[in-house]
């Protein structure tokens, strides 16, 4: 498959604290920010119908970097994390030295682990390079079943395979997906995330048909999503055997949508300042 790893979606309870963590601890930058008055037709913001926002944040343009999508539902101020998400791996000597000076734990692989305000873990390793998201790690219940889905059904090549974990990627230089065998049953709870990939627009329907033929799970069938003042995109939302959510979005539309917005950070700060949603509860 000709796919491109794009981003991982986090639902967050406190937008201000979250943005502070990603910009001041992990040195990321706000790339674009969008506000929506009603829930996403492809459940991009989770199973919620109210007002929400999307903030893309990362180390560079979405054409060249795997980034994060920060989803904030105005009426929701608490999520419960499950054991589906494991960590995101970022390597950079500069970032490693910075994290060494703050509260962290040492992971088994020698990286430094830190958590965002919602409890999502990030593992920071050493590398003579600018910070780059290398890998998304998720837990799975049945490694072989998960491998078959990602490698055979979704056509993601295997980079490295071990007895308890498998690394895969759609291409050199792309962010990898690492599936890790869990000893516990996977429970996604309310804080579950979603990983996104781009795919040629004219092949999205055939991908959907392939998933149907394989009796795979389709959360949202192929649909067009509108973003006020920006490009429309086509998406289909799938789920793997452990219900990890997967978005495939048309590459052409997404490249038009995902241009860096120089006004995004100031717009985000203004929306945070005006946010009185805690009073709604």
From Swiss-Prot:
Q: What is this protein called?
A: Glyoxalase 1
Q: State the superkingdom.
A: Eukaryota
Q: Name one Pfam family in it.
A: Glyoxalase
Show where the VOC domain sits: 4-127, 132-251
What SUPFAM superfamilies does its record include?
Answer: Glyoxalase/Bleomycin resistance protein/Dihydroxybiphenyl dioxygenase
Family membership: Belongs to the glyoxalase I family.
Q: What does this protein do?
A: Thought to act as a glyoxalase. May remove methylglyoxal from mitochondrial proteins. Has roles in reducing oxidative stress and increasing lifespan.
Q: Does the keyword Repeat apply?
A: yes
Q: Which body tissues produce this protein?
A: Expressed in the following tissues in both larvae and adults: pharynx, pharyngeal-intestinal valve, intestine, anal sphincter, vulval muscle, seam cells and the nervous system.
- GO BP terms, alphabetized: determination of adult lifespan; methylglyoxal metabolic process
State the UniProt keywords alphabetically. Answer: Repeat
